[in-house]
Amino acid sequence: MKDYLVKALAFDGEVRAYSVRTTNTVSEAQRRHDTWRTASAALGRSLTAGTMMGAMLKGEQKLTIKVEGNGPIGPILVDAHANGDVRGYVTNPHVDFEGTEQGKLRVYQAVGTEGFVTVIKDIGMREPFIGQSPIVSGELGEDFTYYFAVSEQTPSSVGVGVLVNGDDSILAAGGFILQIMPGAQDETISFIEDRLQKIPPVSTLIEQGLSPEELLYAVLGEDKVKVLETMDVQFNCTCSRERIESVLISLGKTELEQVREEEEETEVHCHFCNERYKFSKEDITNLIENL
């Protein structure tokens, strides 16, 4: 099954809902960064939340998420675009902890329970929108829920889950975001709160193979949900050799000549996708000649 996202309304417009399958997306991130189990879960949850938050934007708009906790995984960075493209990395990919007796990964131990979630939105204005909230649990779903309440004043519920196999490969990943719209009835809010208490964890639902639509039906009730739009999502980095060449050219002739003099081979590393671009002395000479 391909990865895709669903945008929906529920309860006659009282609730805005997003749901996504990100199994392939998180698998690609795990492959590129060689993340261990707990790091994969943390990065995967962040990518899943970022994908849905990106889908709230329009056109060429994009956002960056920084999760900066006090745990050994270090900062997590995610870039997400309105078109479904997402990329991201963890600072320390080789972090893992023993799971609970129920097999649940201890993501909070990797992320830490103190720190901040920062969201930077580039929505075409002169200055980006920057929102920040403290980490409240380190499990990330709760932390993004709190972010929406504090920074965007939008009562929300964020559920994100990643299942990791014993060999570090990704079994399943996905999640949902529910947002209460202004004027929603108390009965609607109570109904959703009750459902959220009763449904299995997100990771259990996605392990059962539920589609994004079925995930929303499980949370809200099939008769309450109206699907508005679906779109493909994927791990996609914007870096390329041409872009890196442009960055090198921007250094100017003097600095490029110094690089050519000092290095047999110049390597530029993209943290987001772990791609490495190598430039020989001849490559650098060609760049200088094109200035």
UniProtKB/Swiss-Prot annotation:
One of its GO terms (molecular function) is protein folding chaperone. Keywords: Chaperone, Cytoplasm, Disulfide bond, Redox-active center, Zinc. GO terms for biological process: protein refolding. It is found in: Cytoplasm. It comes from the Bacteria. Disulfide bonds join 237-239, 270-273. Under oxidizing conditions two disulfide bonds are formed involving the reactive cysteines. Under reducing conditions zinc is bound to the reactive cysteines and the protein is inactive. CDD domains: Hsp33. Its main location: cytoplasm. GO terms for cellular component: cytoplasm. Gene3D superfamilies: Hsp33 domain, HSP33 redox switch-like. Pfam families: HSP33. Redox regulated molecular chaperone. Protects both thermally unfolding and oxidatively damaged proteins from irreversible aggregation. Plays an important role in the bacterial defense system toward oxidative stress. Belongs to the HSP33 family. This is 33 kDa chaperonin.
